[in-house]
Amino acid sequence: TSGYVGDGRKPIYAIRPGGKGTINLKKGAVDKSIAWRQPKAAPYNPSTLVYKDLLYVLYDFGFFACFDAKTGAEVYGKVRVRERERTPFTSSPWAYGDKVFCLSEDGDCFVYKAGRKHELLRVNKLDELCMATPGMARGSLFIRTASRLYRISE
């Protein structure tokens, strides 16, 4: 997890490989180890996801955003996952087959088309509390809910 409180002021930094010594992250500082920064982009619980050169950010209270992973440029800003309703997220998003998946604490799995356009494809319902990030192993996806463990494979 990011370790940041979701107060809208926590940054995301992209650090270049091979950086050495003290990396200066102070506002306005210039450090060649920092590729780019987004000053207000960090979630609290979910980790960010880089997939096909895009950085996807899922925020704890139901917003989803996308940035160019190489430059930090905003592709699309915070979009509410569910219109007019707060949707809590603890688990981190994952990607597979040109899709990005976001599993809410309510047990709803939001399936987005991966890419530069915000496009919700479907919502799959588990109808049970989900707090853990799904695991992947040996060609299967494992989803743990409050009372069940699902294994999904082709």
What are these regions (language model features)?
Residues 1-154:
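Noncatalytic, solvent-exposed loop/strand surfaces
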